Amino acid sequence: VALNNGHVVITVKPMKPVLRVFNNDGSYYINRSGKRISADARYYLDVPVACGNFDSTFTPQHLLPLVDYIYTDSVWSSLVSMIKVNTATNIILVPMIRGHVINFGDVENIENKFLRLRHIYRNILPVKGWNYYDTLSVKWAGQIVATKRKKGLAAPVVKIIDESEFEA
């Protein structure tokens, strides 16, 4: 806006990224309206990460309703670390909790799928054990399908140091 005194007033509204995308085009962010924002390797924003197979029929923008749901719920935003897109109907959520992945299916009926997941996390995993299942699936309507782990998880690479070894 130009003022009478010859000055120009510029109003800038920064775009706020809500998702980091890694695909064949490289890495970039998108905001809530789906606009692409360049990513700079010098800076990092703590937003959900999506990677996988995107094309003209299923773009990262199609994930925005899912990202919005995750982003507005403190439990899910703390739990979900990555969204992996195999196909438009085979979306995998990778939780911070090691040991299993979540087959979310497509981006339809998001609230219902998260209600079923909440049931699993509150009622089933505390009883069966956090490493009992390999995959938790809410892909199909009205169902929770859990795939039992065939093998145990690899032991974490942690060496316990006996402090008595260092005594003189």
Language-model features, listed with the residues they occupy:
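A sequence-composition feature that detects small, non-aromatic residues
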Residues: 2, 39-41, 50, 88, ...
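Short, basic/low-complexity N-terminal boundary segments at the transition from targeting/disordered tails
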Residues: 3-6, 61-65, 76, 115, ...
